[in-house]
């Protein structure tokens, strides 16, 4: 009878097995009508899309820009914070024009202090630093306020994705907080860095100590090539939609890469307001797998996704699912274990990662891979 197994190898083993021959679903991926943007399709597309978005005074609900397939020249997966944080800090320290960070969770601590210090150093040398953080994940009005105040005092432009309207700190005279449900709870879970317009980082990790000290197991990926222009557009449109200032010369943010690359990839967005094309892309990957399907995700609870995983195993695909032996979310863990018998009976291999909390979000389907910040929850 099939059973749940314990696993003791790192994500790097899975990533290396793909060879990253085709990065067909980079970060999130999209559906809808794709915009011909950076790279071999239309080199000026990302710049023009950003200008159009900014000129229209678009809102956060409109930042789900669909991008076309483009190319990457270099794709470097890094597992564990002790590996990816030093490399990320090197890239930031080498920045000569701009550092842009879109971050769900950025809190004080050893890692937070290290990132803040290098950003303050860059600011002192005249490098532009722009930051978009989530109010729930980063606590900029609470425990993290001093850190963000220091960055702002150093010259950083910081805007916040608020889960509540601007009147969050007070109530109206009649004592009723008029917070429409349509504007509450729209957390921005993305994690993205764009450095000098030619290097980007994305993945599941925030700027928090538990990613560095071994408590959480995660992966970040460094990319260069044409795809970075799409990432830059994603950041700038989100930053502007939240009220961040944009310069008149946006062209400077989209330099022509020395090597556009040959690895097919595409950026999509999962943004507050209902743009969930990443989930659609994940389903397409699962449904399209013909030989192997490897999934590592911390909160695998979506019933539809689970049905698709079971169906893949049923049609002869070797399916391996890696989850936490010890999750940081007992409700999500209980919900997944409720489906264990169904998955096992379908032929799915379930591997429980011991010790650290699995926080990486990776799907490998044959020779295609999706990575980034997408949780496969309901």
In which residue ranges do the predicted regions lie?
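N-terminal Lys/Arg-rich, disordered targeting/topogenic segments
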Residues: 1-3
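Charged, low-complexity intrinsically disordered terminal segments
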Residues: 5-378
């Amino acid at each position: 009878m099939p059973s749940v197994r314990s696993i003791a190898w790192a994500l790097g083993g899975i990533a290396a097995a793909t060879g990253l021959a085709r990065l067909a679903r980079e970060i999130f991926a999209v559906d809808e009508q794709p915009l011909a943007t950076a790279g071999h399709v239309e080199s000026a597309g990302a710049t023009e899309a950003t200008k159009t978005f900014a000129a229209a005074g678009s809102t956060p609900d409109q930042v789900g820009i669909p991008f076309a397939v483009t190319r990457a020249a270099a794709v470097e997966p890094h597992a564990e914070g002790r590996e990816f944080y030093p490399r990320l800090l090197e890239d930031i320290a080498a920045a000569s024009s701009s550092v842009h960070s879109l971050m769900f969770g950025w809190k004080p601590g050893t890692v937070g202090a290290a990132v803040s210090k290098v950003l303050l150093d860059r600011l002192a040398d005249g490098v532009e630093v722009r930051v978009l953080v989530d109010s729930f994940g980063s606590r900029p009005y609470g425990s993290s306020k001093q850190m963000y105040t220091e960055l702002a005092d150093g010259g950083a432009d910081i805007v916040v994705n608020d889960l509540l309207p601007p009147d969050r700190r007070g109530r109206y005279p009649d004592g009723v907080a008029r917070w429409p449900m349509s504007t509450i709870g729209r957390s921005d879970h993305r994690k993205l860095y764009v450095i000098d317009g030619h290097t980007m980082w994305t993945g599941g990790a925030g700027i928090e100590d538990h990613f560095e000290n071994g408590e959480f197991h995660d992966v970040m990926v460094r990319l260069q090539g044409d795809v970075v222009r799409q990432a830059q557009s994603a950041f700038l449109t989100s930053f502007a939609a939240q009220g961040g200032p944009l310069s008149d010369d946006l062209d400077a943010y989209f330099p022509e890469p020395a090597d556009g690359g040959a690895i097919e990839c595409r950026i999509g967005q999962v943004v507050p307001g209902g743009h969930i094309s990443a989930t659609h892309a994940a389903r397409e990957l699962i449904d399209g797998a013909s030989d192997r399907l490897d999934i590592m995700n911390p909160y695998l609870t979506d019933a539809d996704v689970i049905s698709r995983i079971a169906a893949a195993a049923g049609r002869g695909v070797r399916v391996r699912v890696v989850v936490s032996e010890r999750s940081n979310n007992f409700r999500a863990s209980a919900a997944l274990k409720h489906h264990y018998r169904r998955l096992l009976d379908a032929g799915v291999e379930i591997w429980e990662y011991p010790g650290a909390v699995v926080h990486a979000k990776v799907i490998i389907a044959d020779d295609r891979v999706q990575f980034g910040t997408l949780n496969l929850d309901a």
